[in-house]
Design a protein with these regions (language model features):
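Metal-dependent nuclease catalytic cores that hydrolyze phosphodiester bonds in DNA/RNA
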Residues: 1-121, 128-130, 286
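Structured loops at beta-to-helix junctions and adjacent beta-edge loops in soluble globular domains
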Residues: 31, 41-42, 125, 177, ...
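A short mid-domain helix/strand-loop element embedded in enzyme catalytic domains
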Residues: 121-128, 176-180
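Short beta-strand-loop-alpha-helix junction that forms the active-site gateway
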Residues: 124-141
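Metal-dependent nuclease catalytic regions and adjoining charged, substrate-binding loops involved
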Residues: 134, 141-144, 148, 153, ...
């Protein structure tokens, strides 16, 4: 009997059969309170390979989202839209020429429950029982600023936008699914222009910063640093291999076209992708 081998194989199961590839944009779901964390993400800094266990957690989140959408569709007197009727794809907002993008879960409308016919943005998250109780006690903004920033930027992306026209979204129906008890926490979050612009400014600074920002903390055991994907670069001074154009400290975004350009040499995007960076360029860790 090879039960131990079977356990090992099961533990490693769950990764996609095909690599999903790196996003060509910075997702709004990647907001972080540390500006250096945002900088590393914006520059495409390599992270640790994702474990199979983590992939399974991601898949569980997708399953919970589907389950919750199914529940919402069973509720009378409310319209649930999962895709943009104009594109046939998931609802999307973007900023700075497409360098920053976000996709939200659904859009809904119900005069019966919400007292008006205007559409609401919808976002679904899941949490363990401990964190779920925090949402109940303190609300989304104080419990998870990343999620709060995410939906504020989503709503901001629908304002004064030709694609959205008369359908700008100024409220978000935020739903948290308790993974332990299957309870639901529901909160209506109002759009706040000033806060959304603040969060987007953080993203913009990360894209355009010519130098590595200061650390959030010099203490590697500080909770924000301890669980950071880039702790090994920040606190252990691991060098960054110059594999992609965005990992060069001289690269800057074109905030209109969504492309990148080099501020130090005349190197071109495809040449850097194929042949590697020139010797004149430096790692963002230097």
């Amino acid at each position: 009997m090879r039960l131990d081998l079977f356990k090992e194989q099961v533990a490693e199961a769950g990764k996609p059969l095909q690599p999903t590839g790196e996003r060509s944009y910075f997702g709004l779901s990647g907001f972080h309170t540390c500006q250096r964390n945002l900088y590393y993400k914006a520059k495409g800094t390599p992270r640790k390979p994702i474990e199979s266990r983590v992939y399974r957690i991601f898949q569980q989140g997708h399953d919970i989202e589907d389950q919750t959408i199914g529940l919402l569709k069973q509720v009378p007197n409310i319209l649930i839209e999962e895709v943009d009727p104009e594109t046939g794809r998931q609802f999307e907002v973007q900023f700075y020429g497409g360098h920053i993008k976000g996709h939200f879960d659904f859009r809904c409308r119900s005069e019966y429950y919400f007292g008006e016919t205007t559409r609401k943005l919808g976002e679904i998250k899941s949490a363990n029982d401990k964190n779920f109780k925090m949402y109940e006690k303190k609300g989304v903004q104080q419990t998870n600023e990343t999620y709060y920033a995410q939906v504020q930027c989503y709503m901001h992306g629908t304002q004064n936008n030709e694609h959205w026209k008369d359908h700008a979204l100024t409220q978000c129906l935020f739903i948290v699914f308790n993974k332990n008890t299957a309870e639901l926490y529901i909160e209506m979050i109002d759009y706040n222009k000033a806060e959304a612009e603040h969060y987007l400014e953080c993203f913009k600074n990360a894209l355009q910063a010519p130098e590595l920002p200061e650390k959030y903390s010099d203490n590697p055991t500080f909770y924000i640093c301890r669980f950071c994907d880039f702790a090994e670069y920040c606190h252990k001074d691991k060098s960054i291999e110059l594999e992609k154009i965005k990992q060069c400290k001289h690269i800057q975004p074109n905030m209109t076209s969504g492309n990148w350009f080099c501020t130090k040499t005349d190197c071109e995007f495809y040449k850097q992708q194929v042949g590697g960076l020139t010797e004149k360029c430096q790692s963002i860790s230097q």
